[in-house]
């Protein structure tokens, strides 16, 4: 089962999900390990990230709507400072 799902959502879909009311997270250019205790959905507002997993590497850029599944262990490589809306589901 894929633990990283990258999609493009329309403005209407984002509005229906209430993304604009979600929290905001920012991070400067860096690298760090991360694991997910629950599912997270996020909309990348700015930046460029590579997420390295056992399944492979994922390139994530602004405009991507990403779901990180519970149990995922990965390494984030923030290539350009990132800003995202996020929500744990």
Q: Could you describe each region identified by the protein language model?
A:
Residues 9-11, 18-37, 69-70:
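Conserved short histidine dyad/triad with adjacent acidic residue
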Residues 2-9, 14, 22-23, 57, ...:
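Cytosolic regulatory regions built on CNB/CRP/Popeye-like sensor folds
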Residues 37-50:
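Short, conserved beta-strand element in jelly-roll/cupin
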Residues 32-36, 53, 77:
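Short histidine-centered beta-strand/loop micro-motifs
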Residues 70-89:
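Ligand-binding loop in jelly-roll beta-barrel domains
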Residues 54-70:
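Short acidic-glycine-tyrosine-enriched beta hairpin
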Residues 1-3, 17, 83-89:
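Double-stranded beta-helix
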């Amino acid at each position: 089962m894929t633990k990283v799902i990258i999609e493009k959502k329309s403005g209407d879909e984002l509005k229906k999900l209430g993304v604009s009311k979600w929290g905001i997270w920012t991070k400067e250019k860096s690298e760090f390990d991360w694991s997910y205790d629950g599912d997270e959905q996020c909309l990348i507002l700015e930046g460029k990230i590579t997420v390295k997993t056992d399944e492979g590497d994922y390139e994530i850029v602004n405009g991507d709507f990403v779901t990180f599944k519970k149990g995922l262990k990965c390494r984030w490589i923030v290539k350009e400072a990132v800003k995202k809306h996020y929500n744990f589901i």
